[in-house]
Every structure is written in C-alpha cells, then in structure tokens.
Amino acid sequence: MPYVSTADHTQLYYKDWGHGRPVVLLHGWPLSADSWDDQALALANAGYRVIAYDRRGFGRSSQPWNGYDYDTLADDLRAVLKECLVSEGTLVGFSMGGGEVARYMTKYNGAGLVQAGLIASIVPYKLKTPDNPHGSDEKLLDETLAGIQEDRPKFFAEFFEKFYGVDKAEKPVSKELLQWSLNVAMQAGLKATLACMESIFKTDFRPDLASFKVPTLIIHGTADQNVSIDASARPAALGIRNSKLIEYEGSPHGLLATDKQRVIDHLLAFLKG
C-alpha cells in the first residue's frame, strides 16, 4: 500500500486513482479516505486524478501520540501534495477536513492549488463564543469526550444516526451504512479521536479566510445537526472571496452518502468551470 512519510515520520496511507488534473480529498472525523470513495470513483472516471489519504491517527495511517493540531495537519497535507507532485490541483475538505484546507491556505499560501472546496465543513469556527453565537457550547465538547471514553462503540452508533439525519430523513441511509461507518470510526486511535475533536472545537479559522485566493465551492446541508450552517458555511462564504455557497435544503451532515450524486454533480461542474 502507498504511504507518505511526514516530517515526524508518521506514515500516511493514501490512494491515487485515475489520471488528469489532480483533486485531493480530505475526510472528516472520525472516518477515513474511504468515505470519499463514491465521489473519488466518479471523478476518476470523469478524467481527474484523485488523491485521498487517511489523516494521522485514522484509518490505515500511523497512530502517533502527537500532531493532532491543525498546524501539524497542514504540514501533513503539504507532505502528501509534495510526494504526489500536485500542481494546479483542487483541494476539497469534508467536515474536519475543511480545517486543513483553511490552515494550508494560510501556512503554505495555497501552494499547488487553483481551486478549493468546503463540504459540510467546520470552517470558520465551531466553538460558541460571544462573537460566534451560532457555534456549539463547550459543554458539548466535554460530553463528547466523556462519551467516547465511557463507551466508544455506543457513542459512535448514536453519533452516526445524527450524522446521517436518520431521524429526519424521508429515505434514511441503510443500517449497513451505519454499521460500516461505526467500523471505520473504530479503526481510529483513541488518542487521535479525542485530540482531533478538541482541535475541531478550539481552532478558530476566521483569520484564515482571507488566505483563500482561489475559487472556492462551499456546500452545506441546512439540517446539519453536527455543524450548524450558521456557524460554518454561511460566514465562510461571506469571508472567502470568490466563493460560491450551495445549500442543500433539509440535508444532514453526512452529505457524501445522503446526497452523494448531487455532491458528485456539483464537484464536476465546479471542476469544469
């Protein structure tokens, strides 16, 4: 299996499909690059080179003790882009992966990129503060960390029902997809799972928005129960120049599965545009 070695010798598993202009896909918490497979296959079949990797601590990548802050995660992303010789690429982050996109824009000035995408992303700020009233209470972070440590399988079984909007969907995802998601989440290291959730809540990407210098597609569901659209996509669209926001009315957080064809169609249109 192909791996990239990072600055601290962490081994990152990646898949490299197809040929053409590169598209790099960053997965969400607590999944792996496999969560992008439907979109990756469609983009590769459409004539693009698709690169997706497992974040450190997740999937098939190494599980180091340190390095789950967004500065290090942006360094990991840079290592993948350099190893794969990415130029004139499109970088798309889902959920937690949106943070890596934002921090990469600031830390590396978007090197090698001509487009960006944020899908159900946490950007710009997850935590509720006086100047970010639509964010999530820190109490939710505490409850999440406690729930994971008390009974991780039970926590994630309940988490994914909300993630995919099972209780609100006219056509819920299958129980098999829920089980698969749980299986993938349990591949991640416990330290990575906890530390990344803290980074998701506590990293303020609002200063990074000005660093986006490329056309940026933003997609978000209006019924997202995990990342409020009012704390993420809408302010991100206001803060990122040359961005386009597409709202999926009534859709939950797990858009890559619940709205997979619509995401594929919008990505292809964006890439061709």
Segment roles from a protein language model:
Residues 1-24, 45-48, 86-87, 241-246, ...:
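Alpha/beta-hydrolase fold catalytic core
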Residues 72-89:
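Conserved acidic catalytic loop of the alpha/beta-hydrolase fold
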Residues 102-107, 111-150:
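Flexible "cap/lid" loop of the alpha/beta hydrolase fold
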Residues 211-251, 259:
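Conserved loop-alpha-helix segment in the C-terminal half of the alpha/beta-hydrolase fold
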